[in-house]
Amino acid sequence: MPAESGKRFKPSKYVPVSAAAIFLVGATTLFFAFTCPGLSLYVSPAVPIYNAIMFLFVLANFSMATFMDPGIFPRAEEDEDKEDDFRAPLYKTVEIKGIQVRMKWCATCRFYRPPRCSHCSVCDNCVEEFDHHCPWVNNCIGRRNYRYFFLFLLSLTAHIMGVFGFGLLYVLYHIEELSGVRTAVTMAVMCVAGLFFIPVAGLTGFHVVLVARGRTTNEQVTGKFRGGVNPFTNGCCNNVSRVLCSSPAPRYLGRPKKEKTIVIRPPFLRPEVSDGQITVKIMDNGIQGELRRTKSKGSLEITESQSADAEPPPPPKPDLSRYTGLRTHLGLATNEDSSLLAKDSPPTPTMYKYRPGYSSSSTSAAMPHSSSAKLSRGDSLKEPTSIAESSRHPSYRSEPSLEPESFRSPTFGKSFHFDPLSSGSRSSSLKSAQGTGFELGQLQSIRSEGTTSTSYKSLANQTRNGSLSYDSLLTPSDSPDFESVQAGPEPDPPLGYTSPFLSARLAQQREAERHPRLVPTGPTHREPSPVRYDNLSRHIVASLQEREKLLRQSPPLPVREEEPGLGDSGIQSTPGSGHAPRTSSSSDDSKRSPLGKTPLGRPAVPRFGKPDGLRGRGVGSPEPGPTAPYLGRSMSYSSQKAQPGVSETEEVALQPLLTPKDEVQLKTTYSKSNGQPKSLGSASPGPGQPPLSSPTRGGVKKVSGVGGTTYEISV
């Protein structure tokens, strides 16, 4: 019956099993409805219980014999039997317990049938230990369901006998009421039970003999072991126990399962990227921040379409939108070298094309993925306007970076007024008219020098040609920066070495002498340039030591008098070490500085300012305080930390990376205030005081460094 599910439906096959089920269930129901109530009163209440248990047992075995797999062998494939070119033989002989048993070839199932296996003509399947095909259960009886068929026969025989016997007993108790309904129904059930008892009892007896002898109905009918020895028998008791107590035989056919539809994607396909925001974790010189930007699906089409066996694509164009300072400086040099900007930039690594812009603020504005793929001439020519405004808006700013403006922190490019030597103590700063005018002159020199010098053009050349070599440091006459310095009208270049922290700011000192007094008009916004500290050689370190000796031996330089009109211009001058005591932030910086272990009793040696004994107070300056120790550190580090408007994140971002060895050599030479020498903001001396000493005399060689920085090597 299980094998017929996939074939054409035949109603005639279900007539015998349906009749058997109706007679079984119908007769038993009538018996329980009309006969059992009287028997429970007159005979015993156990009569209905016994008949109920027997009926359930019959029904269970009937169901198992009908719906259970008898042990069907699966059919072989069409080419499985093609062992040789010729046709397979019809029989094969095997030996079982010393007896030759013949196996027949099944043309339908295309394999040799195992011993005791036969092909059912009704089910059209080969069944293991085939017994017969029973129409009353509409299923073949084989090895797997023979036990339930045998128990069905036994239980059915007992149930029929019970129904017939208890029915007869009920009639005997109501012999005077034979015309009654209960007695009439009971006699009808007895007739049906008696009618089925003869064949069922006969069939049960026959199978009892077969089980005792260890044979099947097929073997018994066909007479395979007639007159011979049965190799499959193990004795009467073993045969009975094998049928009733052995473990169930394995199933050879898999249960039919519903096919599931599974969508399989090739491994080279990536999941679709939605136009959502992608959070990127970045590291910016110790600053951890999150960047939220929109990334479109089209931005990943190029990388997804490339395969390993395809030819490599041409190098991508550099994304100069990340280097705002480089774009500005290249734009300033377009008048001298326009060929560098007219053509596309040279190839850069592929990672820069698909690399997002980094920011230290999570609230930065998102830029499109493909913005500013080329460096346009129009964008670069717009930058001098902001530089021109920087001469009218004085401010102090830390060393610039190459971050684009759109990806910069909102507080990164702001101007913060502070006193470089007082570590953020605004009450101890000095406002000097002479110092104010002198500082404005240095700030104005950015515009004049930035448009004529070729230092930024050398930065572009270094970007294209690689890092600066050692020979270029020793032969500064070959660099374009040296020619631009010689072409200038400066007769007396300053003496000494300019730190790479002062990128292209030597012009501020020269222009300050020619433009000492300028009125500020507003805040400044200067474009940054990169800072590199990893290219100092031994010759440069030696020049630092030689320059320090020259500073100690150089005579004082006269300083201009104060301008009373500029006393309250708003720019704070740099006080001497004896004007105001340092705040606690300087002591914090001394812990980080390698030279912070200077004894407190040792005064600081001024580099670009007047000595401690020669410095006077400016207009409105406070009383001199105790002399602060020289911490050997640039004041831009300590002054930034104490500013209330500058956060800790900005302080870390503004500090450039410096190796301990180079930091010691640079900071023993001179101190600087936020990227400016101390001489730019020093207070003017009072009347009667000797002039300041300034190391601006002697021969000097100017060499362009890595990232557009300028090196000054004393001769």
From Swiss-Prot:
Modified residues (Phosphoserine): 247, 296, 299, 345, 380, 398, 406, 409, 415, 425, 429, 432, 529, 554, 621, 684, 694
Region annotation Disordered: where it falls in the sequence: 289-715
Pfam families in UniProt: DHHC
Recorded superkingdom: Eukaryota
Transmembrane segments: 14-34, 39-59, 149-169, 192-212
Compositionally biased spans, kind Polar residues: 442-478, 666-677
Gene that specifies this protein: ZDHHC5
Membrane-topology annotation of the record: Multi-pass membrane protein
One GO term describing the cellular component: glutamatergic synapse
Primary localization: membrane
Domain notes: The DHHC domain is required for palmitoyltransferase activity.
One GO BP annotation of this record: protein localization to plasma membrane
Record's subcellular location: Cell membrane
Protein name: Palmitoyltransferase ZDHHC5
Stretches of the chain found on the membrane's Cytoplasmic side: 1-13, 60-148, 213-715
Modification sites for Phosphothreonine: 294, 303, 348, 350, 411, 436, 659
Job description of the protein: Palmitoyltransferase that catalyzes the addition of palmitate onto various protein substrates such as CTNND2, CD36, GSDMD, NLRP3, NOD1, NOD2, STAT3 and S1PR1 thus plays a role in various biological processes including cell adhesion, inflammation, fatty acid uptake, bacterial sensing or cardiac functions. Plays an important role in the regulation of synapse efficacy by mediating palmitoylation of delta-catenin/CTNND2, thereby increasing synaptic delivery and surface stabilization of alpha-amino-3-hydroxy-5-methyl-4-isoxazole propionic acid receptors (AMPARs).
Enzyme Commission number(s) from the entry: 2.3.1.225
Modified residues (Omega-N-methylarginine): 617, 697
Keyword Transmembrane helix: yes
GO MF annotations in UniProt: palmitoyltransferase activity; protein-cysteine S-palmitoyltransferase activity
Domain DHHC, first and last residues per copy: 104-154
